[in-house]
Structures are given as structure tokens and as C-alpha cells.
Amino acid sequence: MELEPQYQALRQMHGEDMTLIREKLYEFFSGWLGGPQLFVEKYGHPQLRARHIPFAVNVQVRNEWIACFAQAMSELDIDKALAEPVLIQVFAMADWCRNQNEDGIEPPIPPMAVDPWVRAPELQQILSSYGVNSFFKEFTS
């Protein structure tokens, strides 16, 4: 995010020092992926949507975040059999964090309200628009 100009809107939300952001992200994903509940132990329930209210999270920021996340997974050569299920769930969470009304854009859907895989073609298009083409190739037209 810090090195890629295409993630500028996302980067600007985070301030100069990324140390605490990195730490919280690590702690959150530690628990979310089945490891120690580091985030919960320090901060309580994640309540992701509520924690993101202070930030203007729109479709562009959501797209930059998921593309940046997917790019990192691609650069780390994470196997698609692991990466794709994680990405589709993370995309659903990222969409749920949107808090800006935008003309012509449907409001966010709670992550558990619909099978997230129905949105895989949409996610593939988003990733492709950022040059991240390692995942969801079966949805490429």
C-alpha cells in the first residue's frame, strides 16, 4: 500500500506511521484465521463496521484494500486454493465496512447474508482492474 500509487486513497486514510495499523491487522488476522485471538484479547470484539465509521470507506477504498491484500498474497506466492477462499471472505468483510452512500451503488450486504462466492466474478473484475490477475481466473471473460 505504501509503495503502489494505485492504492493512494487507501494509503491516505492511515496517516504517516503504519506501525499500529500493521500490528492491529496482524492481530486481527491471527484470530480470524484460527490462531490466537490477539486482537480480541487487546481490544475486544472486532466490530469491523463500527471500527471503520471514523473513516470514509467507499467503493474505491474497498477496492483498493482488497486489491492490495490480493497483490500481497500473490507476491507471497500463496496458493490459489488457500488464497481464493480467504479473499472472497475478506472481500465480503471489506464491503460490509463501506459507510458512504454513493449514487448507483447498492448499500453493503452483511457478510453472512449471502454466499460470498456469488460475488467472485465481481471480485475478479476488481482485482483485474488493479493488475492482480493471479486469482479467480475461471471468471475471466
Model-derived segments and spans:
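Core of compact, soluble alpha-helical bundle domains
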Residues: 1-141
